[in-house]
Amino acid sequence: MIIGLGNDMIDIRRIEKILIRHSSRFIQRIFTDIEQNKSENFPKRSYAYAKRFAAKEACAKALGTGIAYGVNWRDIGIVNSPSGKPTIKLTNHAQIQLEKLLPSNHDAFIHLSMTDDFPWAQAFVIIEALPRG
């Protein structure tokens, strides 16, 4: 069953401006080390950061909190499976919020889709609860 759904869209040019003005502070406050390494090695780093920013916003919406109630930007990490598929790893308050949404005897699966088409970056998140066993 679907227990959370979120989407977000951001103007890549907004992220480009922030990276020029507040690069280090913005990156350290918002993105995990894994996200930073992935984005810094991307040919168009502003595109990579914008997609990950949109994914974090979409996930926060799917959790029903937004970036509030103790959920921090870095509690929502965008990671890749061994096959390269993007997904989300939650920690701290984001993980606690997810556990509150889960029915008993269910496990959560987070589905993520990210895309960009200049000047837009967009992400969709579906949180699914599946019965154990």
Curated annotation (Swiss-Prot):
MF GO annotations: holo-[acyl-carrier-protein] synthase activity; magnesium ion binding
SS bond list: none
GO terms, biological process: fatty acid biosynthetic process
Main enzyme class: transferase
Keywords: Cytoplasm, Fatty acid biosynthesis, Fatty acid metabolism, Lipid biosynthesis, Lipid metabolism, Magnesium, Metal-binding, Transferase
Localization, UniProt: Cytoplasm
Catalytic reaction equation(s): apo-[ACP] + CoA = holo-[ACP] + adenosine 3',5'-bisphosphate + H(+)
Predominant location category: cytoplasm
Pfam families, alphabetized: ACPS
Classification via InterPro entries: 4-PPantetheinyl_Trfase_dom, 4-PPantetheinyl_Trfase_dom_sf, ACPS, Ppantetheine-prot_Trfase_dom
GO cellular component: cytoplasm
EC assignment: 2.7.8.7
Binding site for Mg(2+): D8, E57
Source domain of life: Bacteria
Coiled coil spans: none
Cofactor requirements of the protein: Mg(2+)
HAMAP family to which the protein is assigned, alphabetical: AcpS
Family: Belongs to the P-Pant transferase superfamily. AcpS family.
Function: Transfers the 4'-phosphopantetheine moiety from coenzyme A to a Ser of acyl-carrier-protein.
Protein name: Holo-[acyl-carrier-protein] synthase
Gene that specifies this protein: acpS
